[in-house]
Amino acid sequence: MLAARNIHLVADSTRVKGAVPESGSEPFTLILSEDSFDSYKIDPPSNELTITKDQLVELYSEMVKMRRMEVAADQAYKNKLVRGFCHLAIGQEAVAVGMEQAIKPDDSLITAYRCHTFVVQRGGTISGMLAELFGREGGLSKGKGGSMHVYTPNFFGGNGIVGAQVPLGTGLAFAQKYLKTNHATFTLYGDGASNQGQV
């Protein structure tokens, strides 16, 4: 007999500490469910978040923009306007938007495919990303990188080889330490890459 998986949605258990102010710029505190973070041999982050209504609207607006870009890319791909692969991240917009809010502009980020939203959040433009998908010279990699091989000054690309971004990210982090910068490198990978030898 198969064991049933218990699924718990923590977003619906988020609550406000005190009252929500009328002003959009006045901060208030959200209390996240204690189940929001699982940790192993490390302290989890605080489950309290101080934010304003204006900031929440801005985050939501960015997520909607990222979704609309990915939907446009999907339509273009289905209409055969995009050559090669087109790896979308529809439904994962909050990851790119949330990370960009948490890290510094000079921090480095590297990932695998499904990187369009990270490219835009790290300084690329939606028009540049779409031009890249269409193979245009105005694309972020001059139309030669396609869906995966796109770069901005602190985004070191999606990577076409599953898990290959991990050793590259390690090298970026080592360079930051060697140069004594006050920056971090974030290397992102998914379930499939977690079983690769270099990870």
Feature-to-residue mapping (PLM):
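N-terminal amphipathic, basic-rich helices that act as targeting or association modules
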Residues: 2-114
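Cofactor-binding active-site loop characterized by glycine-rich and histidine/acidic residues
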Residues: 71-75, 79-199
